[in-house]
């Protein structure tokens, strides 16, 4: 038996990963305590997804655990034992605004929670791949220094710039920029994941995603803008655009495409 531990398993990427790797023959140990409801209110609750996973996936087991609780996490890792073959860490506090209001909670979930998972992986399954859903917010406001051209309907990177064709890559610095407290806690987690890979020779990887979307997203005004926009359109609720003359450009990535990249 192959076991995959997936945190944030009822969220957008975690649920997609749970279904995908279950279809590949993994038994999935899903960890999610619906903290998204605490962050954003009842409309953001992921309980509906948890119930759907438990109903539709034969080999899915759910653990309602806070990833800041190292002892509770340890019990899950020990139960998985030598069958633990993969860790996908999707759980996070994802809001800039919420992080500013509760920085200790934000850092505890994003940084300390990640450290707990890395250390348990090192202790119990050091050969298992550890996939971390980081964020493009690790770059802070550095992208704002790119040569931007204002067009009639959008801002666009100058076509002569190397990032124009394929977007920003890891050559962009994460230093000397304004990150928000959320971005800073994710930087800490991102660097920890890299360091465990290099220092302990573990198989770790960071995916610095942004504007991820899909049918499993419990979108709210503060997070999950495309899902929230669709919800507003369906319910005929006004949708508010903040700043930049409404010319922001976002390249949305479907959750299935990201999880397929995990597999590749």
Task: Label the model's feature ranges.
Residues 1-210:
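N-terminal Rossmann-like NAD(P)+-binding domain of SDR-like oxidoreductases, especially those catalyzing
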Residues 224:
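Glycine-rich phosphate/pyrophosphate-binding beta-alpha loops
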Residues 99-100, 165-180, 204-218, 228-253, ...:
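A conserved pocket-lining segment of Rossmann-fold NAD(P)-dependent short-chain dehydrogenase/reductase
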